[in-house]
A protein has these predicted regions:
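Conserved phosphotransfer microenvironments
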Residues: 42-61
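A short, hydrophobic beta-strand element within the central beta-sheet of small alpha/beta folds
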Residues: 64-73
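Conserved acidic segment of CheY-like receiver
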Residues: 9-17
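Output/docking surface of receiver
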Residues: 36, 85-100
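Non-catalytic signal-transmission and effector/linker regions of two-component phosphorelay proteins
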Residues: 1-10, 102-111
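Two-component/phosphorelay signaling modules centered on CheY-like receiver
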Residues: 18-34
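Short acidic low-complexity segments
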Residues: 33-41
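Alpha4 helix (beta4-alpha4-beta5 surface) of REC/receiver domains from two-component response regulators
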Residues: 73-87
Length: 111
């Protein structure tokens, strides 16, 4: 749940490897990154669609903004995430370039 006093959000990482997690933590400091479901619902989900079924992720978190990413060559995965209703679908390289602005924009929509 977004802690508006501290500006800290809980971001659930689904299917995300350790390298991606550490890059995201460095790019977007001040938020709590989780890799498993906690008691509280997350404020945002970031999912690697190469490792997970986008429909399953969207079904589990219908009221939470979702960012899906995969390699830029996985156009089928990007299309599946878009069709599943993800709020943002992005290539992995673009996630690291534009991630902070995308995350901030989606978190602002839940405040």
């Amino acid at each position: 749940m977004l802690d508006s006093r501290a500006g800290m959000a809980t971001i659930l990482l689904c299917g995300v490897d350790l390298l991606v997690r550490s890059k995201l933590e460095a790019l977007v400091p001040g938020h709590r990154f989780e890799t498993s479901d906690g008691v509280e619902p997350p404020d945002l989900v970031i999912a690697d669609v190469a490792r997970l079924d986008p429909d399953d992720v969207a079904d589990r978190f219908p009221d939470v903004p979702i960012i899906g990413f995969t390699n830029h060559t996985d156009t089928a995965g990007l299309r599946r995430a878009h069709a599943a209703g993800f709020d943002q679908v992005i290539a992995k390289s673009a996630l690291f370039e534009r991630g902070p602005e995308v995350i901030d924009r989606l978190l602002a929509s839940v405040e």
